[in-house]
Amino acid sequence: MEIDQCLLESLPLGQRQRLVKRMRCEQIKAYYEREKAFQKQEGFLKRLKHAKNPKVHFNLTDMLQDAIIHHNDKEVLRLLKEGADPHTLVSSGGSLLHLCARYDNAFIAEILIDRGVNVNHQDEDFWTPMHIACACDNPDIVLLLVLAGANVLLQDVNGNIPLDYAVEGTESSSILLTYLDENGVDLTSLRQMKLQRPMSMLTDVKHFLSSGGNVNEKNDEGVTLLHMACASGYKEVVSLILEHGGDLNIVDDQYWTPLHLAAKYGQTNLVKLLLMHQANPHLVNCNEEKASDIAASEFIEEMLLKAEIAWEEKMKEPLSASTLAQEEPYEEIIHDLPVLSSKLSPLVLPIAKQDSLLEKDIMFKDATKGLCKQQSQDSIPENPMMSGSTKPEQVKLMPPAPNDDLATLSELNDGSLLYEIQKRFGNNQIYTFIGDILLLVNPYKELPIYSSMVSQLYFSSSGKLCSSLPPHLFSCVERAFHQLFREQRPQCFILSGERGSGKSEASKQIIRHLTCRAGASRATLDSRFKHVVCILEAFGHAKTTLNDLSSCFIKYFELQFCERKQQLTGARIYTYLLEKSRLVSQPLGQSNFLIFYLLMDGLSAEEKYGLHLNNLCAHRYLNQTIQDDASTGERSLNREKLAVLKRALNVVGFSSLEVENLFVILAAILHLGDIRFTALNEGNSAFVSDLQLLEQVAGMLQVSTDELASALTTDIQYFKGDMIIRRHTIQIAEFFRDLLAKSLYSRLFSFLVNTMNSCLHSQDEQKSMQTLDIGILDIFGFEEFQKNEFEQLCVNMTNEKMHHYINEVLFLHEQVECVQEGVTMETAYSPGNQNGVLDFFFQKPSGFLTLLDEESQMIWSVESNFPKKLQSLLESSNTNAVYSPMKDGNGNVALKDHGTAFTIMHYAGRVMYDVVGAIEKNKDSLSQNLLFVMKTSENVVINHLFQSKLSQTGSLVSAYPSFKFRGHKSALLSKKMTASSIIGENKNYLELSKLLKKKGTSTFLQRLERGDPVTIASQLRKSLMDIIGKLQKCTPHFIHCIRPNNSKLPDTFDNFYVSAQLQYIGVLEMVKIFRYGYPVRLSFSDFLSRYKPLADTFLREKKEQSAAERCRLVLQQCKLQGWQMGVRKVFLKYWHADQLNDLCLQLQRKIITCQKVIRGFLARQHLLQRISIRQQEVTSINSFLQNTEDMGLKTYDALVIQNASDIARENDRLRSEMNAPYHKEKLEVRNMQEEGSKRTDDKSGPRHFHPSSMSVCAAVDGLGQCLVGPSIWSPSLHSVFSMDDSSSLPSPRKQPPPKPKRDPNTRLSASYEAVSACLSAAREAANEALARPRPHSDDYSTMKKIPPRKPKRSPNTKLSGSYEEISGSRPGDARPAGAPGAAARVLTPGTPQCALPPAAPPGDEDDSEPVYIEMLGHAARPDSPDPGESVYEEMKCCLPDDGGPGAGSFLLHGASPPLLHRAPEDEAAGPPGDACDIPPPFPNLLPHRPPLLVFPPTPVTCSPASDESPLTPLEVKKLPVLETNLKYPVQPEGSSPLSPQYSKSQKGDGDRPASPGLALFNGSGRASPPSTPPPPPPPPGPPPAPYRPCAHLAFPPEPAPVNAGKAGPSAEAPKVHPKPNSAPVAGPCSSFPKIPYSPVKATRADARKAGSSASPPAPYSPPSSRPLSSPLDELASLFNSGRSVLRKSAAGRKIREAEGFETNMNISSRDDPSTSEITSETQDRNANNHGIQLSNSLSSAITAENGNSISNGLPEEDGYSRLSISGTGTSTFQRHRDSHTTQVIHQLRLSENESVALQELLDWRRKLCEEGQDWQQILHHAEPRVPPPPPCKKPSLLKKPEGASCNRLPSELWDTTI
C-alpha cells in the first residue's frame, strides 16, 4: 500500500497516525508471509543453523553526517576517535563544515576546524561554509569561521559573497560588516569586485560578436552564450546577446532554454528580462518541466505563471512586446535576498520523524499511565471567550473637578499635592493629571470605571479630553492614539512604580481600550489578548508580600495599527529578564511561578499520579517557603484558573495533546529539582543518589537515563581536538541540575511567547502594509526586603535606569534645549546622584556588572577574588551614591567586614545588598554535555527548545522573521554599474583578502561585544539597551503608579508612605516643569507641518517669509499667550498644543461641511443626469424597436411590390419590342390625335403619362426613392446657373400670345411651382389605381398615344410673359446659329442617368409649329396672376438652314446636392453680367422636357430636377400616393406624402430651391427620418461611382406619409455659403442600406460606394402649421386646391418620339477595368445585382434594357405613368465611357469648383453647336473628337466622411438569398 507524501502531510495528526498504523500492520503481515514462504524453501533451515546473527554495518562517514545533523556531539566525538575522516565530502561536494554551518552545530565545527578542515572549501555551487552560515543566520558559525581565517570575499556561482546572503539587521550581517570595516573594505570595493567576472564575460562576448561570431552558436552540449549568461546572472551580457539577435527559446541537448536556467538559479531580473522580450514560458525540458516547475523561489514561479497566462492570451490576440512587461511593475532589484539553493530546505523534522517522536510520546504516556486517554486531535475547538459570570455593566464616574490637573493648583508644595491626592482617593478618583502625565493610585478594589461603556464615552475624534469627563486612563490612551497618526511617529506608555502599584492592571486596560479600535476584528483581538495575558500571568507571575500577582519579567507590548485604516491589526510581545532564579529559590514569604500551584491544585488525582506529582512539600522547588495549607476556596479558584489556562493555550494554537506535553515538561522540571547527589569515593565526585527518580525524569524528558546522569555529574572539555572528561563535585552537580531546570523553564517560557506572537501576528504585515506602533512598557517595580540579594539588585538596577530615562525626557532635555535656543527657564532640575549609581553598575570596564562577568568566567577550582575586587570598586566609587557597609551612612567605620555587602543610594531610598552567591546566580551557560543530551531528546518541544538559538537578551529566537526590519545588503551590492565606470581600474580586488589578515581579532571581538559570556549581567545590559532603544524611537506617555499603603488594603491611605513615593517620583518637580516650562518643543518645520491648516489659512500671502516669522504669525493669529521663539524651535506650554489642535479641528469641520455640500450638489446633479440619460436610452430603444418593426414591414411590402413590378416590366419590354414597327407607322396619326385631344384632355378625364414621350427617370426614380430615402434628382445645369439671380419682374400677361417662332437658345424661366406642379386629386386617384388594367394588359397597349412631331424653332425666338423678367446677357446669344438644340440635360450628382430620346431629324424643319407652355404667376406677389388662372408662355424655336439634327442627348452624372444655404446679401451679390441671368425660380431649360409631375403643395426650397426644354410641352399628371410603411408623422389633409417638407426655419431667403422631384425622396428633406449629426468634411476622395437602383416600383394600395421624423436645427449640416455660380455639394446619406430587389428578377444595378457629406434632415413642420411665407408656398397651396391643371401638348410628345434611333445601352466599356470588374462581380448573366449597397451620393439612376425605356406596366387611364427602369443610366454610362460626354461628366465630378466645370460644359456645348455636327454622329464616330474641358481638382465636398453611415436599416433585414 502506497500513499503520496503530500497527501500524508495534509492529513490531521490523528487520522495520519491511524493510517500509518494500518499501513504498518499490513507491511508486518506481508513481511511474515514472505518469511514463512522463504523458510519453506529447501536447505533454508540447514543454512540457518550454521549462520551467525546478522548485523547491519553503516559507513562511518554516514554515521558521522547523521550525528552532526542531529547534534549528537558525543557520537561525533566517538566516531572521530574510531577513525572517521573529518575531511569527508558530502553529496553536494561540500565538507562537513558545510553540514555544521547548515545545522548550526558550532561545537562540532570547532572540532573539525581544529582537525584541519578547510574553512574555504567550496561545493559544486562554489558555496563556502561562510555562505551557508550567513544564509541560515548562524552567527556562532560565522564568528567561528571569521576567527579561523575564512575568506569572506569568495564568490559563489552567482557571483555573490557571503554578505549577500546575510539578512540586514541580523547578527551575522553585523559580524561581517564589522569585520570588513575593521579591515578597511568598503561596499564600493565589493561592488567593483563583484563586477569583475560579468565584465570579463561581457568583454569576451563583445570581441566574439565583433569578429563575426554567431550569437546562437552551440558547444558540444548545445549550450549557448545566452544559456551561460542566464545561469550566471549576467544581465548586461544577456542584454547584449538579445540586441544582436540571440534566440530566446533556443534549447540545449537537454531541451533547457535560457528561461529554464534563469528560473532554476533564481535570476529574478533575468527572468523578467526574458519575459519582456517574449520568451515562451510554455516550453518544457527533457523532464517535461516548464520554467515555472523548477523556479527557485515562489516569486519567480508566480511571475512565470502570470507569463504563461499572458502567453495564452497572446496566442488568441497578439500583444505588443512591452505588454507583458507592463503587467506587473517589477522593480529593478526585485528581491533583496538572493534565492537560496535548494539544499537549504526549511529546518523542520521529516514527517516520519515527527510521527516517530509522537508515537514515543504516546508510548511514554502509556508506560507511565499518562494523562490523555482520548484520541489525539490536531485541534480542539474551544470557546475563545473567557469564562465568568456575566454581570450588567456598572458605570460610576465622578464629575470633573478643579483639581483634576495638579499643574493648575494655586499653591505648589508637597503638602498641597498630598492633600489633593488624598482627597481624590477618598472620592474614588484614582486618576489625576499633571499636565500630560497621569498619576494613578491603586485602590486595591474593583471600581466600575472600566466597562466597555466607559471606554466608548472616552472615544474622541481629536484626542482632546472631554470637559464633562474626569481624568481617566482611557483619555490618556485616546490622546496617544490620535497623536500616533498626527505625528506619524510611534507612541509608547511607560508605567513605573513599586511592586503592587497597579502597573500590570493598567497595561491590560490600555490594551483593552485600544482593541476597541480594531474595527471588525475587535472581538477576536480582544479575546486573544485576554488569553495571552492569562498565559503570561500563569507562567511569569508569582505571589509576593507586596503583590499577589507580581510580574517576574519585563514585558513590552507592541500594538500595530494600520496607517491607512487607523485600526488595530496585530500585536507582538517582547519579554526581558525573566526571573529564572525564582524557580530554584524564593525569598522569604514569596512563591514560585503560579503555574506550578495551578497544576498542583487544578489537576485531578489521576492526572497528578500520571505526572508523579505529590503535594507541595514533596518537591524541593515548592517547599522552600513554608506556607499554610491552601484553603478549599483557593484550590477551587486554582482549578478554575487551570481550566481557563487550558482554553487559552488552545486558542493560541496548542492542541490538547500539546498542552499535556507542556504539563509533562513542567512536571519534569519539578522532579529534576528533586534529584540528589552523593559522593561515593574520596574524590568527592558526585553521583545520582536516586536512580529511579533519575529514570523517571529521563523518561519525561525522553532522553537516555545514562546520558542524563553522565551530563549531570561530568563535564566534557576539548583541548586541541582531544576530549577531556572531568567529574563534578556535589556542589557543581547541583548547580548544573538547577541550571538545567532554569534553562528548560526559561526556554519554555520563550517558546510560549513566540507561539502567542504567532497568534497575535497580523496577517497583513507580510503585504507591506504601513503600520504604526503603540508600545506599552511594564517593568517589575522597585522592591526592598529585609535581605536583598542579586535578584533584587537586578530589579532595582532596571528601575534606576528607567527612572533616569524618564527624568532625562521630562527635565534634562528641556533644560538643555532652552539653553541652546536661548530661552529662559523659571525652574532648574538637578539629577542628583543618579549618574553615580548608574556608573557604578554599568560603567565599562570597571563597573559592577563587568566585574561580576569576569569572575563568572573563572573555573570552579580557582578561588574567587570577587570580594576583594568589589571592595576596591566601592572605594573608587562616588561615596554619595555607593558606599561600603564597613561605613555607615555618616561615614563611620563599621565593626564587621561584610565582604560582599554594600549600600546603594537609589532614587527611591537607601538599600543594602548582600551579593553572596552572585557569581553562581550570574552564570547562565549550560555545559556542552547537557546540551548534547537535551538536543537528542525525542520530545519534539524539548528538541526544538535546545536546538533553537538564544538571543543576546536570553530569549528564544522567534520562529518567524521580523518583516518590519527585513532587508538585504545585496541591494547595495547589486546596483547597476556600467562598463565605463570600471574601465581603467587595474586594481585586483581579489587581493583584498590580504587586507583582512593585517589586524588581529582582539579589536574585532571588542567591537562585536561578542566576548561577553552568557551571563545574567550581560543579558541585563543588552535588555536595557534594547528597551531604551525602542523608547527613544517613540513619543513617550508617562503613567506613574502609587501604592496607597504597604498592606494591600482598600480605602486606606498612608500619608507618610504616599508622600515618600511622591517625593522620589518627583511629582512636585513635574508640576513645576509643566506649569512654568515648555514641554512642547517643536522645530519650525515641524510646527508648520503639524498645524498646516492654520498655516495655510493665516499665511495666504506671506508664505515667502522665513519659517520663524511664519510660526510667529500663526501663534499671533491664534492669540496664544506664553509661548517663546528660539533659534530653531518653538517653545509652547502643554495647553497650547490642545488649543492649536482645537483650531485645526474647527477648520477641518468647516472644510468637511463645505465638501459635504458640494458633494451633495454634485451627487444630485449626477443622479439627475443619470435619470435623464436613462430616460433617453429608454426612449431611443423604444423608438429604435418601433422603427425597426416599421422598416421590416416596409421592406416586406417593397419586396412584394417589386415582384409585381418586375413581372410587369418584363412583359412591357416584350410588348415594346413587338409593337415598335406599329409605333413607327402610326407616329403621325398619334401626333394628330394628341393635338386634337389636347384641349379635351385638359378639361376632363384623367391625365396620362405616355411612356414613349417622356423620361422614365422622372417617375420611376421619384417613386423608387421613397424607399431609398435621399434625393435622386438635382437641379439641371440651367437651374444651377440661375439660382444666384433672383431679380425679376412679374408678368402682367394672363392670356397666351400668338405662337411665334422661337430661338433654340431660348430658355424657359419656369418657376419652381410650375416645374413642380402638383396633383390635386392624388388621394382620389390612389383608390382608382386598383381597378384599372395593368400596364402589360391589352387595354394598356390600345390606349397609348403617339406624340406629335417635333416643331421647328427659330433660334431668335424669345420667351415673353415669364414670371420674372429675364435680364442680363444670355450665353446662347453668342452661340452660332448652326448649333440648335445642343444644350443637353445636365445632371448634377445624384441625377438619374437617362438616355434621352433623339431629336427630330432635319427634315422636319418646315413643319415646325409653335409650342405652348402653361405657366402660373407668383402667388405671393400682388401683381401676380390669380391662383386659379394659368399663364401661357410662348416659346418658338426654328432650326437654322444649315443645322444638323435636332437636340441629341448626352449624360452627365454626379452627386446629388443638398440645399445650399446662403445669406441674403450673398444672394444679391451676384454680378449682373454673369453667364446665367435667369432668375432662380426659372432654370435655363434643356431642349428636352419630360412631362411635369405635379405634387400636393408644400413650401419647399429645392429647385426642380426635371430637364426642362423650350421644346417640351408641359403635361400635368397626378402621381399616386406611395405606401412606405415607415410610420412617419402623418401629414395633414392637402399635403402630399411625396413632396419635400421643409420648415421655415431651415430655409433662408437666399436658399436655393431644389427640384420637387428631388425633394420627393430627398434624404436631406423632410421625407427622411432623423440621422446622426454630420462628421467634419473629409479629405478629397476618389470620384463616386454611378449606381443603378433597383428595377421595381412600389405602389402600395393606400397613401402613407413619407417623413419619418424631423431633426432639430442643431442636427443640420454646416451651412455652405457658395459664391455665385458655385456648384452644389453632395447630397445626404441614404436612409436605407440596400434597395429591395425583385425575387423574380434581380435588380440591374451597379451600386458603388461614393463619398458624400451627411446632411441631416430638418425638423418637420406640416403645411397647415406654417404660414405662407413666399409665392412658392402660396402657389403650392393653389396646386393643392386642384383649381389649375397644366396640360402638355401633343406636339411636345411628338418631339420626343424620334424614329429610327435605338441604342444598346447595356454594353459596358472595356477601357474601365474597375467598372467591368465590379459589374462582373455584382451581376449574374442576366445583369442582376446581388446585395451591393447603394451609394448615398449617387442616389438615383435609370435602368433600361438594350437602350429602350421600360415602362412601369400600369395603364394610362389609371393615372399612372409608364416609367422606365433605373438601369438605363448605368448602362448608358458604360457604353459612352470614351465619349466626350463621359469625359465632361468625369471632369465635373472631379471639379473643385463645380461652377467652373459647368461653365466649361457650356463652352463645350457651344463648340459642338458651332461645328454643326449631328449629335448621333458625335456619339458613333470616334474621329475627330472635341477635346473635353480641362481637368479640375477633386471637390472636397463630394467625398463621404469616414464613419458616416448612410444606412438606417441593418443589412440583415435585406434577405439577399431571395
UniProtKB/Swiss-Prot annotation:
One of its GO terms (biological process) is phosphatidylinositol 3-kinase/protein kinase B signal transduction. Gene3D superfamilies: 1.10.10.820, 1.20.5.4820, 1.20.58.530, Ankyrin repeat-containing domain, Kinesin motor domain, Myosin VI head, motor domain, U50 subdomain. Residues 1370-1385 have a biased composition (Low complexity). Residues 401-1145 form the Myosin motor domain. SMART domains: ANK, MYSc. Residues 1533-1545, 1715-1731, 1763-1773 have a biased composition (Polar residues). Residues 1346-1355 have a biased composition (Basic residues). Phosphorylated on tyrosine residues by FYN upon stimulation with CNTN5. Residues 1111-1377 are annotated as: Involved in CYFIP1- and NCKAP1-binding. GO terms for molecular function: actin filament binding; ATP binding; cytoskeletal motor activity; protein phosphatase binding. It is found in: Cytoplasm. Residues 1219-1245 have a biased composition (Basic and acidic residues). ANK repeats lie at residues 59-88, 92-121, 125-154, 158-189, 191-217, 221-250, 254-283. Residues 1147-1176 form the IQ domain. CDD domains: MYSc_Myo16 (cd14878). Keywords: Actin-binding, ANK repeat, ATP-binding, Cytoplasm, Motor protein, Myosin, Nucleotide-binding, Phosphoprotein, Repeat. InterPro entries: Ankyrin_rpt, Ankyrin_rpt-contain_sf, Kinesin_motor_dom_sf, Myosin-XVI, Myosin_head_motor_dom-like, MYSc_Myo16, NYAP_C, NYAP_N. Residues 373-392, 1219-1250, 1282-1307, 1326-1409, 1448-1674, 1697-1731, 1747-1778, 1821-1844 are annotated as: Disordered. GO terms for cellular component: cytoplasm; myosin complex; nucleoplasm; perinuclear region of cytoplasm; plasma membrane. In the N-terminal section; belongs to the TRAFAC class myosin-kinesin ATPase superfamily. Myosin family. In the C-terminal section; belongs to the NYAP family. Binds PPP1CA and/or PPP1CC. Binds F-actin in an ATP-sensitive manner. Interacts with ACOT9, ARHGAP26 and PIK3R2. Interacts with components of the WAVE1 complex, CYFIP1 and NCKAP1; this interaction mediates PI3K-WAVE1 association and actin cytoskeleton remodeling. Interacts with KIRREL3. This is Unconventional myosin-XVI. It comes from Homo sapiens. The lineage of its organism: Eukaryota, Metazoa, Chordata, Craniata, Vertebrata.
